């Protein structure tokens, strides 16, 4: 199951992403890469994009294994289908969702 951390994140992910997460986590995957293409495209090198879903040890999170020890490429997922357009659409949806949460809080 995906562990989501923004209001409406699961629905946004399901709507825009073509690839699964790495056990609910994101790093250099379609999701993060799309967001970076939207906000700071000069930092993204799509020619280096590779799919990698490293084996996740059953003790991950309960021992001292760092996320950096598990992936050869640094990728956890598949950044290849990432686009600036997806990132922009997700950012727009995040903004709408968090605005609704803030409006509820100030009522």
Annotate the PLM regions.
Residues 1-107:
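Extended, histidine- and acidic-residue-enriched regions that form the cofactor-binding/catalytic faces
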């Amino acid at each position: 199951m995906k562990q989501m951390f923004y209001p409406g994140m699961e629905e946004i992910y399901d709507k825009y992403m073509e690839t699964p997460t790495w056990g609910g986590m994101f790093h250099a995957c379609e999701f993060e890469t799309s967001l970076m293409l939207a906000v700071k495209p000069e930092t993204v090198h799509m020619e280096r994009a590779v799919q990698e879903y490293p084996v996740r040890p059953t003790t991950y999170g309960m021992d001292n294994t760092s996320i950096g020890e598990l992936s050869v490429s640094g990728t956890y997922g598949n950044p290849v289908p990432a686009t600036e357009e997806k990132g922009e659409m997700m950012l727009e949806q995040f903004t709408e969702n968090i605005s609704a949460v803030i409006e509820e809080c100030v009522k």
